[in-house]
Amino acid sequence: MKTAVVYWSGTGNTEAMASAVAEGMTAAGAEAVLLTPAEVAPGDLNAYAAIAFGCPAMGAEVLEETEFRPMFDACKRSLGGKRAALFGSYGWGDGEWMRTWESDCDSAGVNLVCESVTCTETPDDAALDACRALGKALVE
């Protein structure tokens, strides 16, 4: 199975999470590709059976608005029928950005197949294990 992890990271925290998600996908027998928003056009995602999206909370608990949000908005309606999952880190607040993102996905018909993974600041071992489990669940 061909899978993708599409992520934006400003500090390296979400990038570390993305790598762990890809490890989980690979451990479950999938081919995993790591991509940044700049590397993704809407039609590109048709090549993947499962896609994990990662983005940290920015500002007032929103998705990164310059690169990630425009890419995701352009792609989300074409994700119907694909297995998808979300992950990301945040520095303050209570994770509202993830709940808003999940609701946006639900409204767009995105098939979120497992619970999203969030962590505060730098992911610890437990968060990285949760990311690996997310990658595995997305593939199975």
Each predicted region: which residue ranges?
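Aromatic-flanked redox-active Cys/Sec active sites in thiol-based oxidoreductases
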Residues: 7-11
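FMN-binding flavodoxin-like domain, especially the glycine-rich phosphate-binding loop
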Residues: 2-3, 13-16, 20-37, 43, ...
